[in-house]
A protein has these predicted regions:
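Non-catalytic, usually N-terminal nucleic-acid engagement modules in DNA/RNA processing proteins
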Residues: 13-104, 121, 196-199, 233-234
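Eukaryote-skewed repeat-based solenoidal scaffolds used as protein-protein interaction platforms
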Residues: 69-73, 80-81, 85, 90-234
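Phox homology (PX) phosphoinositide-binding domain
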Residues: 2-17
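Intrinsically disordered, low-complexity segments enriched in small/polar residues
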Residues: 1-3, 24, 52, 220
Length: 235
């Protein structure tokens, strides 16, 4: 389904894609984040944004998006920018989404935003961040960013909600940083990982962070959590 934009935001703009209109006239978009929903498909069940699958090349270099701001454009084409960083580094991209579009289009690959979904959050907080990640992903795809979908989850009980809207049979990215050696966190991560495999059936996984015992190495490419060049393929 297509989001009923005019029913949600019955406002007219001279140029809804104008950086000046949407990022300089307002300190943040606030309620005008509804503008991002224009032209985006949503699931019929819970109205999560629908993210299209990715089937392109596998990148060789990962770097956090906030570390790339001062890099010359000539170096951006071979880099995969990720949002596996503090939420404070992601918020500017949410608050000023149009401001960064032209720059993001110059980057070879961009992984979905990764607003945190913590186990100690209440459910609505988890779903809000899941919604934001999907909305930003669909918005980027619609505006010419070479986006790699990156599903995430916070608990097994609501895994279907976390996965709703992410593409099936796609190359995806998955993060394990922050899990560490905590047994409960590893257990939650692995349970969600197996459920994600069953629901989305990804064709390949770009894995950022440490390998977790029991995951599918045969369909994974592993990238170290150091924001430096280098990668290795799963066996």
């Amino acid at each position: 389904m297509t989001y009923p934009y005019q029913k949600i935001l019955p406002l007219e703009f001279e140029n809804p894609d104008s950086n000046q209109l949407l990022t300089e006239s307002y300190k943040t978009l606030g309620a005008l984040h509804s503008v991002l929903c224009r032209g985006i498909e949503f699931t019929s069940k819970n109205q999560f944004p629908i993210v299209e699958p990715y089937s392109g090349n596998i990148p060789e270099m990962f770097c956090s998006v906030h570390r790339l701001r001062k890099k010359p454009d000539s170096l951006l084409r071979g880099i995969c920018a990720h949002y596996y960083t503090s939420d404070s580094n992601i918020e500017p991209f949410w608050n000023y989404p149009f401001r960064y579009l032209q720059w993001l289009r110059k980057i070879g690959y961009v992984i979905s935003t990764d607003f945190s979904i913590y186990t100690n959050m209440v459910l609505i907080q988890k779903l809000w961040n899941s919604f934001r990640n999907k909305l930003m992903s669909a918005f980027y795809q619609r505006n010419g960013v070479n986006l790699i979908p990156a599903p995430s989850w916070g608990d097994l009980d609501n895994i279907e909600l976390y996965m709703e809207g992410w593409p099936k049979d796609s190359l995806i990215a998955v993060n394990s940083t922050g899990i560490g050696q905590d047994k409960q966190c590893r257990h939650i991560w692995l349970d969600g990982y197996y459920a994600m495999l069953d629901i989305l059936k990804p064709i390949h996984i770009l894995r950022y962070g440490a390998y977790m015992e029991g995951e599918r190495k045969d369909i994974s490419t592993y990238y170290p959590n150091n924001n430096k060049p280098g990668y290795r393929y799963g066996s």
